[in-house]
């Protein structure tokens, strides 16, 4: 998917000719799977010999989700010999894993249940690739995908979109941001897009992480129940709203001006299909010149890739989110995106949003179940809006 702008709208419909744009081009990812357990019959000391995550889930389909959580401090190792343990970027309980390093922790599971795993980690200057690792429960891989996991980095534009002497625009170089990040382990390599879960019996267990590509600093690993995204009705009921629907002018965000992105390949692109596709340096498109007026296309197609934007909201109120987009590659199909607001998917309406095939540019306001625009409550000030590639409902089919 590629696009040129977000628009944070008054709680109303979007005009297809408003010049806000977004485009969706997507390829089907390679097959893979993942999740974890300490008691699965398919567990193995070799990831290649372990069962698939699909079979693992089937094996534990009647086991309950955890209602309690346990946090492992990364410096609380069984054996810290040869590892760098201590303070890193204002956090004092961390461990650095270089390539091929392993770390093992002992922890107590408070209940017999299925647990998700969330890493609090820091990127380290290296080759700029995704950080890959494996994990084992009690010395075994619970399923094959536990042998192939990855965590994303964060990138920003190193400068602005430049205009050359011939009028063509040049995309800026990408610069990595080294910072603390949080990610729940998900299956971004297969057809499922599932959150990886592990089955743990109540009691003591060990958890081993081995870095296989790129170094990584770990702060904490949290085992917890799978997050439940509320329905739109539940979300609205949970908001302590002090204002009504926003009725001002739309807040337009150029899609090519992402605040951060998950991959260095996500650079401003160009569109020559629509004359009204605006850019940061021009309100009109050009058939003759390269104007960096979109973001995405084929470089934004793999589950887990994301783009984030900062929006400055003028007043408290209820807002809808619209995207002008082009999705002209997956004929007869839709591609899907999750939308996060300040780090969370607000409601199920913002999960797995369909961007359907169209040979021309189209506009979409995130819809509710009845087709009318769904809404989010924003307070005055800055907020983060993030779009993430997901297979959405297609994962159930695949």
Residue ranges and their predicted role:
Residues 1-9:
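Sec-dependent N-terminal signal peptides of Gram-positive bacterial secreted proteins and lipoproteins
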């Amino acid at each position: 998917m590629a696009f040129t702008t977000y628009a944070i709208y008054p709680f109303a419909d979007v005009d297809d000719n408003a010049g806000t744009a977004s485009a969706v081009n997507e390829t089907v990812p390679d097959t893979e799977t993942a999740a974890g357990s300490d008691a699965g019959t398919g567990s193995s000391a070799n990831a290649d010999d372990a069962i698939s995550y699909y079979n693992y889930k089937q094996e534990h389909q009647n086991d309950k989700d955890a209602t309690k959580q346990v946090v492992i401090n990364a410096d609380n190792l069984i054996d810290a010999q040869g590892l760098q343990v201590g303070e890193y970027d204002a956090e004092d309980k961390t461990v650095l894993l270089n390539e091929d390093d392993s770390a093992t922790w002992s922890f107590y599971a408070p209940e017999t249940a299925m647990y998700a795993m969330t890493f609090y980690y820091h990127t380290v200057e290296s080759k700029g690739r995704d950080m890959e690792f494996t994990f084992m429960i009690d010395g075994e891989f619970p399923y094959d995908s536990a042998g192939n996991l990855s965590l994303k980095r964060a990138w920003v534009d190193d400068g602005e979109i430049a205009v050359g002497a011939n009028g063509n625009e040049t995309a800026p170089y990408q610069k990595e941001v080294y910072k603390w990040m949080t990610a729940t382990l998900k299956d971004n390599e297969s057809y499922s897009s599932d959150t990886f879960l592990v089955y743990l019996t109540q009691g003591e267990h060990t958890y081993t992480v081995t870095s296989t590509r790129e170094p990584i600093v770990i702060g904490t690993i949290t085992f917890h129940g799978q997050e439940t995204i509320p329905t739109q009705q539940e979300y609205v009921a949970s908001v302590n709203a002090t204002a009504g629907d926003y009725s001002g002018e739309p807040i337009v965000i150029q899609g090519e001006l992402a605040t951060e992105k998950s991959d260095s390949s996500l650079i401003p692109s160009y569109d020559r299909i629509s004359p009204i596709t605006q850019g940061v340096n021009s309100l009109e498109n050009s058939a003759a010149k390269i104007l960096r007026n979109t973001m995405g296309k084929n470089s934004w197609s793999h589950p887990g890739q994301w783009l984030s934007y900062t929006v400055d909201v003028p007043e408290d109120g209820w807002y809808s989110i619209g995207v002008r987009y082009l999705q002209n590659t997956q004929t007869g199909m839709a591609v899907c995106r999750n939308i996060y607001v300040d780090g969370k998917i607000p409601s199920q309406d913002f999960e797995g949003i369909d961007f359907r095939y169209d040979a021309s540019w189209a506009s979409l306001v995130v819809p509710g179940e009845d087709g009318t625009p769904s809404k989010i409550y924003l307070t005055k000030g800055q907020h983060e809006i993030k779009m993430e590639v997901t297979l959405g409902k297609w994962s159930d089919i695949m």
